[in-house]
A protein has these predicted regions:
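Residue-level marker for buried hydrophobic side chains located in beta-strands
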Residues: 16, 36-38, 72, 201-203, ...
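Active-site-adjacent loop/helix micro-motif of nuclease/hydrolase catalytic cores
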Residues: 45-50, 80, 211-214, 271-275
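Flexible, acidic/histidine-containing loops and adjacent segments that form or flank the divalent-metal
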Residues: 1-15, 20-21, 55-70, 81-226, ...
């Protein structure tokens, strides 16, 4: 394995947002040196999983004998699962990305899982994605319900380190979006909230404004899972990670802690902008918006909502683009940039680095 890099020995959090065009691939290295992967997008030019396999995974703390503590697929659209094959190996468990927590919107139809079932007739994907969808179904058919976050069992704790998943049961999403199949598929998205100290991040996948409002309102069929990496909190709430009960609501988290980093819903497109989300935040806007998207070359690509790119959509942070410091309201992968964000957990502001070469980003934290 070689010399353990500096980043693997710190109590900071590192969030990688990879340039995969119109798709999503995010990796969180928590302050406890555990890994959470959110979505498996890729591009013709870059494989996030190959980069992670070489540079990050060997140095992570194992969770239940797995190098990646949790893999999350927000929803089963092709641009979010193009590298799903990395989770599959001949014996089923040899992949370095194999996790004891494979997490996705439910698609089981038997017994107690039936109220969680996805309507696959309404999931629309482009031709050529059939193999990835089959792998998705095969892989997740064997996972253990209920949907969970990490079960905190460590002897180590980090103050104010926590994260949660929020989602709506698929049959309720079908009621919210009873006619538009694309909105139904996007509305299934699992939302991930991460907090370390005063720094916070929300990853909402491709969730629609209507579904996001339902989550914020705590409407029927809304589920939440939450892990606080603290022994006392864990003992006081032993089932926060696997049952919906008195976990904090997403709206209360946003109101109490604010939002440092918002990964824009649905690649920042105008159709995904949520006024309810902004009204729920402390100060009514995040510090910075991240847009994971490709360069728009035709009218069918849609338009990025201009509010994300101005002081109306964020308060702004100083970011390092290559070697140049700039104040930005939003950052994007569209110009070929990968993004690395550091939460120190002890104050200050998040550090944000952009570079076309992820190896150069790695040197920032080694």
């Amino acid at each position: 394995m070689g010399t353990v890099p500096k980043w693997a020995q710190t109590l900071q959090s590192y969030i990688w947002i990879f340039n995969v065009g119109r798709g999503l691939s995010i990796f969180i290295r928590t302050a406890l040196n555990q890994g959470i992967m959110y979505d498996f997008g890729s591009s013709q030019d870059f494989s996030p999983t190959e980069f992670l396999k070489k540079n990050i995974l060997p140095y992570l703390e194992a969770y239940k004998k797995c190098k990646v503590a949790q893999t999350v697929i927000s929803h089963p659209h092709a641009d979010h699962i193009s590298e799903i094959s990395c989770l599959v190996s001949k014996d089923g468990k040899n992949s370095p990305f194999y996790s004891s927590l494979h997490t996705c919107p439910h698609d089981k139809t038997e017994g107690s899982a039936k109220p969680e079932a996805i309507d696959w007739e309404r999931i629309k994907n482009p031709e050529g994605s059939e193999d990835n969808i089959k792998q998705y179904k095969d892989l997740y058919a064997s996972r253990t319900l209920p949907l969970q976050t990490i079960c905190y069992e460590s002897s180590r704790s980090v103050p104010n380190l926590e994260y949660g998943l929020f989602y709506i049961r698929p049959p309720v999403v079908s009621e919210i979006h009873d006619s538009n199949d694309q909105d139904y598929g996007n509305g299934l998205s699992l939302l991930l909230f991460y907090r370390h100290g005063i720094h916070t991040m929300l990853i909402p996948g491709d969730i629609t404004p209507d579904s996001l409002k339902h989550v914020l309102d705590g409407g029927k069929g809304m589920e939440k899972r939450y892990t606080v990496f603290d022994r006392q909190k864990s003992s006081e709430h032993p089932h926060w990670h696997d049952q919906s009960n008195d976990q904090p609501s997403l709206r209360s988290l946003l109101k109490n802690h604010g939002l440092s980093i918002l990964v824009a819903p649905h690649h920042g497109l105008e159709s995904g902008f949520s006024e309810d989300l902004y009204l729920s935040m402390k100060n009514n806007k995040p510090n910075l918006v991240v847009v994971s998207d490709k360069r728009h070359e035709s009218d069918t690509d849609g338009s990025i909502d201009g509010r994300y790119q101005s002081e109306n959509g964020a308060s702004g942070l100083e970011v390092l683009v290559g070697d140049e410091k700039q104040k930005q309201y939003s950052v994007s992968t569209r110009n070929g940039h990968h993004i690395l964000i550091t939460f120190e957990g002890s104050g200050g502001t998040p550090k944000v680095f952009l570079d076309s070469d992820p190896e150069r980003l790695l040197k920032r934290i080694e």
